[in-house]
Structures are given as structure tokens and as C-alpha cells.
Amino acid sequence: MKKKTKVLQELIHDGKCHLRPLVAIPLQAQMAEALGYEVVGISGAYTAAHILGMPDAGLITMTEMVENAKRVCDATTIPVIADGDTGFGNAINVRRTVKEMIQAGAAAIFLEDQVAPKRCGFVKGKEVIPLEEAVGKIRAAVDVRNELDPDFVIMARTDARTAVGGSLDEVIRRAQAFEAIGADIIYVEAVQGRDEVKKVRKSIKCALAASAWDMKPYPTLKEFTDLGLCLTLGVMFFEAGLIADYEMLKNMKEKGLEYWYEWREKAQSHPASWQRIYDMVGFPKVREWEEKYLPKEQLDKYDKSGGLYEPR
């Protein structure tokens, strides 16, 4: 089997833009893989909200992000792009962050040029560090990549477009500097329209990714490809799940437990029903291992016990 880093290198250089859903938990990555997605990203914002109940404001630690990344990477065979925030310190800290993410099994990391504490790229109040300091951080990341796995993908993100004092010229200046020291992908946050994407694309030769929140109407995947992008950014599909959670809780509160029972009966055949989720996370594999490794008499438990689900 090819290394995940090698697979991702091939994806970002195949001339197509790939849809990259953002996840925070292993099960979401497993769902994405089961549905045929080729790559997933870990959202720092969603991870902070999911495991801490806190905003994406520089409050989550490197250890928490790495531990979560390892769980996601272990659960899927497709490449995972990890969120490295600002590297959790200066260029020296970046070295350790990149090393830890490589050891966790990530295929890539993106590092941004915001000041610390940083904030979600969609939130007002962003500031960026001086270019020289940002270059030092990306250089540190590239050095660790070259030492440990030359195929590991370094995605250098700049928030300079909508940060205090930001401009497209500053975005291009930073993109060119990051490319010159070995970044594999330039990631531009909050690019303001298709014309700006085209200008950035013409200014660099390496792979390019850009968020689409300020591009109206929103581009199709084909248009992203035509614009020369290699990955979509910020496909936060988990919003749909959170809305569904909210509606379920609201309806149970207002209509009682009967609402849950009725909904549950209708959901039995859905590909994401709890029985199918048990299949997805590996109960059948556990039974396969039991049959391979355990004494035969211990397998009688399946015939001598009851339950709503039997792994097969």
C-alpha cells in the first residue's frame, strides 16, 4: 500500500481540484472514506468546539490537536490534512508540531501566519505576523519534512488578505516567499473573488488552495479546477449534523419520547443507522479476530446471549 503522503502528493498534482470535507472525529473520516472521498481535513475550529466546547481562538493545545489527529488518521486509510494553527509558538515550536503530526500519521499540515493567539479565519480581528517571522516558521516545517518524510505535504496558509492592513499584494508577496522556501501548497484564506484567485495562481508555480466564502456565487468543483486549485477548503459538512442534532433535541423536548421512537423506526434502513455504524467502526472485524484467536468454546457466547445486533 502506498504511503498516505505519497498518495496526497499525487492528488495535489493531478490537475484536478479535490473535495476535502472537514472532520473532527474518526467516525466522520470513516464515513467520508466509505463514500469514496480521497482526502479529508481536520478542522481546528470544529475540534476545539467538539472536544473542548471552546472557540477557535488559540485555546486548544498542540497536544490536544495531535492526539485527535492520531485518532482520525488511525481510523482511515485515506490521507488526512491536519490543522497546525500557528504552529503553537515560534519556528522552534513549529519543528516539534510538524514532527508530532508526521508521527501521528497525517499526510499534511497547514500552518498559518496569524499572530498568537490566533482566531478562526472567518472571524474579524485577525492580525498576521511579519513576513520574515512567517518565513522562518515555514522554513522550519520544510526542514522537518525533509528530515522525516520528503512526501509529507506542507501547506502554508496566509490570512493577509483580510487581516489588519491586509491586501492582495501582501498575499502574493507571502505566497511567493513561502513557495521559494519549499512549501508544497499555498493556502489563501478569505480571497475576495475569482479575479484574485487568478492573480495569485499566476504569481506562483506550486499547488494552490483557497477558501471560497467570499466568492459569490460559490464556485463549482469544476470551476475550482479551472481556476487552478488543487483542494477545496472549508467544506464543513458537520454543520448539517449539528443542525440535525439540534432539531432532534428540540423535537424530543417539545413532543416527547414518542417523537424519538417514531423517528427511530424510520431510520432503521439508513446507511448511517446505528447498526451500520457498528459495522463501519469495526465490530465485524472484532468477531473475525475472535474466531481466529479465541478458543472455540468462547465463541458460544453469540448463541447463548441476546442483543439487537450481531457482528457478521
Predicted regions, residues:
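Alpha/beta enzyme core
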Residues: 2-210, 214-233, 240, 247, ...
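A general boundary/transition motif marking the beginning of the first structured unit of a protein
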Residues: 129, 237, 277-281
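Intrinsically disordered, low-complexity regions enriched in Ser/Pro/Gly/Gln/His and often acidic
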Residues: 178, 253-256, 282
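Short, isolated positions within intrinsically disordered regulatory regions of eukaryotic proteins
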Residues: 182, 264-267, 278, 293
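A residue-identity detector for tryptophan
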Residues: 213, 260-263, 274, 289
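Shared catalytic-loop signature of beta/alpha-barrel
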Residues: 227-272
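Gly/Pro-rich interdomain helix-loop hinge
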Residues: 269-283
